[in-house]
Amino acid sequence: MAPSNLPPVFNATSQDIEMLLAAQCHLGSKNLQVHMEPYLWKTRPDGINVINIGKTWEKIVLAARIIAAIDNPADVAVISARPYGQRAVLKFASHTGATAIAGRFTPGNFTNYITRSFKEPRLIIVTDPRTDAQAIKEASYVNIPVIALCDTDSPTEFVDVAIPTNNKGRHAIGLVWWLLAREVLRLRGTLATRETEWDVVVDLYFYRDPEAEETKEIADETKVAGAEEVGPAAIESGYVGDSWDAAAPGAAAPGAAFAAASATAGATWEAEASGDWAAESAQPNPETKW
């Protein structure tokens, strides 16, 4: 599924297309914004709008070329108020040198020069035009170009480059940011050739729930020893394999020990019982004198 509007060198590989499909980047919402119609491929019977993956790749390459054209990487601001995109923008910033704004966008970041967090970027990239509306609005006041990850129902007002994709799933958001970072590094020459594999795995860009990770660690620590952990312990204690009848080294056989003990006990009982009980009972008790 190679886009026809790109030079052959920029065409997506089959692996890139498979990753976009596996992350469900092509699944939009049931609502359709009029400006997103050119990126629509079809509408499923259940009402889900399907995005054209070829258009998604074209816009990723276009956005990467815009980012690579900026001399100072720190002049690019990547923004995500949506939790699923915060880890992705932080990783993108660390790999490309951009400035990350993860979490709540403080009003006045681009317009109020008195605030400590005042910034003057030359380009901003947002994860969702709806949740990052404040950043887009302020960028329009100071003439900052905007690149946005847009779903089929996303508002495109003041958005200069829209990357059509699913911007609600954590895998879709992480994958698009990862592809964008890889393409920027290719254009800058950090990656020698387009055939060179990037050693950063896409999983680093995916959102991870801290509470779920903590619960998993606690479960691993309190894990009860399984059957596979009993075997080595039994071998170390002197028992070989699963045979419970085998004696430990230096110990006598259980049957022989029981027979010897029984023989000794029988001889002793017979010796004690040889006395005359009648003679003992006939003896008168001595009188007690007070």
Swiss-Prot record:
PROSITE patterns referenced in this protein's UniProt entry, alphabetically: RIBOSOMAL_S2_2 (PS00963)
Domain of life: Eukaryota
InterPro entries according to UniProt: Ribosomal_uS2 (IPR001865), Ribosomal_uS2_C (IPR032281), Ribosomal_uS2_CS (IPR018130), Ribosomal_uS2_euk (IPR027498), Ribosomal_uS2_euk/arc (IPR005707), Ribosomal_uS2_flav_dom_sf (IPR023591)
One GO term of the biological process aspect: ribosomal small subunit assembly
Gene3D superfamilies listed in its UniProt record: Glucose-6-phosphate isomerase like protein, domain 1
GO molecular function: structural constituent of ribosome
Subcellular localization(s) per the UniProt record: Cytoplasm
Pfam families per the UniProt record, alphabetical: 40S_SA_C (PF16122), Ribosomal_S2 (PF00318)
GO cellular component, one term: cytosolic small ribosomal subunit
Predominant location category: cytoplasm
Keyword terms: Cytoplasm, Ribonucleoprotein, Ribosomal protein
Function: Required for the assembly and/or stability of the 40S ribosomal subunit. Required for the processing of the 20S rRNA-precursor to mature 18S rRNA in a late step of the maturation of 40S ribosomal subunits.
Similarity annotation: Belongs to the universal ribosomal protein uS2 family.
Protein name (database record): Small ribosomal subunit protein uS2
Natural source organism: Talaromyces marneffei (strain ATCC 18224 / CBS 334.59 / QM 7333) (Penicillium marneffei)
Annotated gene: rps0
